[in-house]
Amino acid sequence: MSRGSSAGFDRHITIFSPEGRLYQVEYAFKAIAQENITTVALKSGDCAVVATQKKVTEKNIVPETVTHLFRITKDIGCAMTGRIADSRSQVQKARYEAANFRYKYGYEMPVDVLCRRIADINQVYTQNAEMRPLGCSMVLIAYDNEIGPSVYKTDPAGYFSGFKACSVGAKTLEANSYLEKKYKPNLSEEKAIQLAISCLSSVLAIDFKPNGIEIGVVSKSDPTFRILDEREIEEHLTKIAEKD
């Protein structure tokens, strides 16, 4: 459908077009892709891994202040893809929800419950005229004592689901295709990290430097969400280069 034939339906979040589309929600997905960041996440064996690009857009920016990985609780981490201001707002909301859950019930909020709650909030943003959908997508990883490693994703439409492997961002179709071909269910932590790096490197057609990628990991042996430092990333990049 042409731009002109939308007949004003793109101006209102709460009104469906005759074709059953919510244009403002679709535009939120486009905002995510326009940030030109790709994120991949996977769970395998006893670990879950998330990897995303790190882009420092100006020379005068302090690199340590640029990140797309955030800790929600001690054991739940996330990668945010899309508009960074919207991303930080959603992370803050997730932290509040997790803290409130712990205060009310006395134990940590499970990752699937947290993702469902964030998705529910996102869905409300699609039906209230005074709000706009957030231009970001959240990928959560955690190690759950009952269900093992977990990867969950939610988006501006309020959809959420658990995944064995998933991607978000500019090259999501290519990354999903790569993961479908290469994914194995019983990878070690090292192999899972290297698969995530190789996936991003392949679909983006670039050779990463340690300061150009961020990686978060949780595992059965260390369920605390941990962000790898540049030295650890360099070790994995070296091993990938040696295999090639």
From Swiss-Prot:
Gene3D superfamilies (alphabetical): Glutamine Phosphoribosylpyrophosphate, subunit 1, domain 1
Gene Ontology biological process: proteasome-mediated ubiquitin-dependent protein catabolic process
Family, similarity comment: Belongs to the peptidase T1A family.
Database matches in InterPro entries: Ntn_hydrolases_N (IPR029055), Proteasome_alpha (IPR050115), Proteasome_alpha-type (IPR023332), Proteasome_asu_N (IPR000426), Proteasome_sua/b (IPR001353), Proteasome_subunit_alpha6 (IPR034642)
Keyword entries, A-Z: Cytoplasm, Nucleus, Proteasome
Function: The proteasome is a multicatalytic proteinase complex which is characterized by its ability to cleave peptides with Arg, Phe, Tyr, Leu, and Glu adjacent to the leaving group at neutral or slightly basic pH. The proteasome has an ATP-dependent proteolytic activity.
UniProt subcellular location: Cytoplasm; Nucleus
SMART domains: Proteasome_A_N
Domain of life: Eukaryota
Broad class of where this protein is predominantly found: cytoplasm
Cellular compartments per GO CC: cytosol; nucleoplasm; nucleus; proteasome complex; proteasome core complex; proteasome core complex, alpha-subunit complex
Entry keyword Nucleus: yes
Gene that this sequence comes from: Prosalpha1
Name of the protein in question: Proteasome subunit alpha type-6
UniProt keyword Plastid, yes or no: no
Pfam families named among the record's database cross-references: Proteasome (PF00227), Proteasome_A_N (PF10584)
